[in-house]
Structure formats: C-alpha cells, structure tokens
Regions:
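Hydrophobic/aromatic beta-strand patches that form the interior of the parallel beta-sheet core
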Residues: 2, 55, 78-79, 99-101
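Conserved small/polar residues in nucleotide/adenosyl-binding loops
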Residues: 230-236
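S-adenosyl-L-methionine/SAH cofactor-binding core of RNA-modifying enzymes
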Residues: 29-84
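SAM-dependent methyltransferases
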Residues: 154-228
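Structured adenosyl-cofactor binding patch, chiefly the S-adenosyl-L-methionine
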Residues: 88, 92-139
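Short, structured active-site "lid" loops
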Residues: 15-36
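Internal, active-site/partner-interface "lid" segment
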Residues: 125-164
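A short beta-strand-loop structural module common to alpha/beta enzyme folds
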Residues: 1-7
Length: 236
C-alpha cells in the first residue's frame, strides 16, 4: 500500500485542489499520483518484474465482473489507484492508466472499498488460495450464470425440506437439477446475463422435466436459437 500524500511536493502535504471550470468537491493532483506510480514501476523493475497493469477505480469506469477478475488474475502485477473526493485529474489517468473500473452503479466516498473488492476477487483465483480450483468454477458468474441454491443439514428445517433430488446420490440428475436451477435463477434475477448466456449457447439441449416443457431449438434465419426465454418449469 502506498500513501499518495508521501509524494506531494508542498509543505502542507496537500493532494487536491478545486476543479478547473468550477463545481463542487476537490480533485486529486496528477503529480503525486504520477510520482507514486513511477516509484512502484521502479520497484517492480528492480525486482525483475514486468510493469504493473494500472487500474484506476472510478465511478466512470467500465463495469467490473468475474470475466475482468479472471483477466486481472493473469497479470504478473496489478496496481489499483483509489479515487477520492470529486475525482482524479484526468491527465494522470490518460498518462498512466491501462483502464478505469467501476464496481457498480453507485458512488462511494473513496476507492478504497472498491480496491478491496477487486483485490479479493482476483486473489481468490490465484493457485493455492482455495483448496480446489472447482471451488470457484461452480460459483455465480463463472460460466455466465448465477449459482444454483445450496442446502446442508438438517434434511428438514422448520418444515422446509431439502429438494429430494439432492438426496438420491444420482450425480447426473443432481447436475441436471442444478443446471436448471442456475438457468432459472439467472432468467428471473438477471435477464441480461441470461440473454447473453443463451446467445453464447445456441445449441444447448435442456433436459425435459416431469412438468412443463423445456426450451426447444428451431431453425430461424438459418440459425438455431431458443424459441424464447420464457419460464422453465422445474422438478420439485
């Protein structure tokens, strides 16, 4: 962790000033951020490491998701620059930044919490952090869908029973049930993700259930695609 204030060149250790053009809030200086990033780059070079991938955490950045976490996990080093106040002088972002990232459509008082979110989501993908690689491959967003519901003991809790299929020991049926639950949960809660998943899996054969019909594939404009993204009736 590097304190930007340590790189200021004024006696007051001031890191911000009023924005050109007027407006509320204060804007972080370019100079201390630039000098801090140069120091980080020099440190990496001295260690024989590649230049860090520089990410500025701003509300105006591109939305953060699991795909981006996997991309960042592939870099040798990543530097996260936390925004604050009204923002950061755009010139230092243009000069040093590889990208700007936002963790959601809301505003925080600073980028520190956002940096922790990014760091945690990236570090957990590193070898040895989780006991098994499968530990994150079955989770929400890994394959573009939300994760299926989870259950543990007791079998019945306050009159609510675990779905019978999970007690059968039939791994094929369990996988089919979980896949259907994952698709249905995504369709209901995140139709944007569901539509994207259907577009990327146009030939996916969905299992038939005891009640209702599964999504069928039809030929339309010489492309196979789902008839619709309507409700999938699931087994109990």
């Amino acid at each position: 962790c590097h304190q930007i204030r340590d790189y200021t060149k004024n006696k007051q250790k001031q890191t911000d000033d009023y924005p050109y053009g007027g407006g509320c809030g204060m804007v972080l200086y370019a100079q201390p951020i630039a000098d801090c990033l140069r120091a980080v780059q020099a440190q990496c070079a001295a260690q024989g490491r590649a230049r860090p991938h520089v990410v500025f955490l701003t509300a105006a950045g591109r939305p953060y998701n699991e795909e981006k976490a996997r991309e960042l996990a592939g870099y040798d080093a990543v530097t996260l620059v936390c925004g604050h106040y009204e923002g950061i002088d755009q010139r230092v972002i243009d000069a040093f930044g590889d990208e700007e990232i936002s963790i959601g459509d809301y505003v925080l008082t600073g980028g520190e919490l956002a940096s922790l979110v990014v760091a945690d989501s990236v570090l957990r993908l590193q070898p040895g952090v989780l006991a098994e690689e499968k530990g994150y491959q079955d989770e929400s967003y890994w394959d573009g869908l939300l994760e299926y519901p989870q259950f543990t003991r007791p079998e019945v809790w306050e009159g609510r029973a675990v779905p019978p299929v999970l007690l059968t020991g039939d791994h094929k049926k369990i996988d089919e049930w979980r896949g259907a639950q994952s698709r249905e949960r995504t369709r209901e809660r995140r139709p944007d993700l569901y539509d994207a998943w259907c577009e990327s899996h146009p030939l996916t054969e969905l299992p038939k259930w005891k009640r209702g019909e599964n999504m069928r594939l039809v030929k339309n404009d010489e492309q196979l695609k789902p008839v619709s993204y309507t409700h999938l009736t699931l087994p109990t």
